[in-house]
Amino acid sequence: EFESGLLTYTTGNSRVNDRFFLGSRKMRGFDAGGIGPRECSNRVCSTSNNDALGGENFAVARFEAEFPLGIPDEYGLSGGLFYDIGNLWSLTKINNNVLYEDGSWRQAIGASVFWKTPIGPLRFNFSDVLKKEQYDRDESFDLTISTRF
């Protein structure tokens, strides 16, 4: 699955609420807003001054395989493996406190457990980040609750 986005403006700059943000919903293995340009004091990011600014361009490719776990079907469990690669870049106006790398493609791999429950499908993702920037925020576990129509 491939997903991308591009913001363009004829006048002015993008606002932070218009920009794209990447995290576990689009790219597994990373925290919400965990990838992309950051506002950091003196171009040094720490846990207390590491605000995500979003980006005007993004691209993500997600590869996934789902398979049975070899247990009875009435349990509603299956497994999966995934590999995600993506990037978030570009800000129209940059000040000296913005830190980011334009061409740095982040990568994550992991395993998933899918569980069909009466409240809806649950998905447990266990991730390992293969490539990231020092200021990115990653996560090793993610739980997704879906609905069925």
Language-model regions, residue ranges each:
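Short basic/hydrophobic patches in alpha-helices and adjacent helix-turn junctions
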Residues: 65-68, 111-116
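Repeated loop/turn-to-beta-strand initiation elements of outer-membrane beta-barrel proteins
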Residues: 71-73, 115-124
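Conserved active-site loop/cleft motifs that coordinate metal ions or position small ligands
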Residues: 78-82, 121-127
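Outer-membrane beta-barrel "beta-signal"
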Residues: 113-120, 138-149
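Transmembrane beta-barrel architecture of outer-membrane proteins
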Residues: 58-62, 106-110, 140
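A short, acidic, flexible beta-alpha connecting loop/helix-capping segment that sits on the rim
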Residues: 128-132
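A short alpha/beta connector and helix-capping loop motif
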Residues: 94-113
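C-terminal outer-membrane beta-barrel translocator/porin domains of Gram-negative envelope proteins
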Residues: 1-77, 81-92, 97-98, 135, ...
